[in-house]
Design a protein with these regions (language model features):
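Catalytic core of tubulin tyrosine ligase-like
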Residues: 27
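Vicinal oxygen chelate
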Residues: 69-110
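Amphipathic alpha-helical "stalk" segments
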Residues: 1-4, 46-50, 76
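N-terminal beta-strand motif that seeds the catalytic metal site of vicinal oxygen chelate
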Residues: 1-24, 65-67, 117
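Conserved short beta-strand elements that form part of the metal-binding/catalytic scaffold
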Residues: 33-64, 110-115
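A short acidic/small-residue loop/turn micro-motif
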Residues: 96, 116-117
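Conserved acetyl-CoA-binding loop of GNAT-fold acetyltransferases
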Residues: 30-35, 85-87
Length: 117
């Protein structure tokens, strides 16, 4: 993931995956993506332009990919989401590389915001 020079831009796309090993095998064979594993439940990829990841889930949800936006000030962005009518669906939590929270916009789309701080 990138940092401050991309403040408030889409930075990362996260997909749900039923199985990490099969997912890595598929995307490596088809598109040549490079992967970095973070344990049995998560892997990240680089395709040369954008980065993303696959998170193991018990069932693939109907909402598909998770768009992740970078913010240099997580708390300020979280407050703006709530103030503007969004709903926090996952409170800020720590993950390898920083912290993030999830929210739904007024249309019900789920997104996430991350910061290295």
């Amino acid at each position: 993931m990138t940092t401050q020079n991309n403040n408030n831009r889409i930075d990362y796309i996260e997909f749900p995956a039923a199985g990490i090993a099969a997912t890595v095998k598929f995307y490596t064979a088809v598109f040549g993506w490079k992967f970095t594993d973070y344990g049995p439940d998560y892997t990240s990829f680089e395709d040369g332009r954008i980065s993303g990841g696959f998170a193991k889930v018990p069932a693939i949800p109907g909402n598909g990919a998770l768009i992740v936006i970078y913010s240099s000030d997580l708390e300020k962005t979280q407050a703006a989401v709530v103030r503007s009518g969004g709903k926090i669906t996952k409170a800020p939590f720590v993950f390898p590389g920083g912290r993030r929270f999830h929210f739904t916009d007024p249309n019900g789309n789920e997104l996430s915001v991350w910061s290295e701080k």
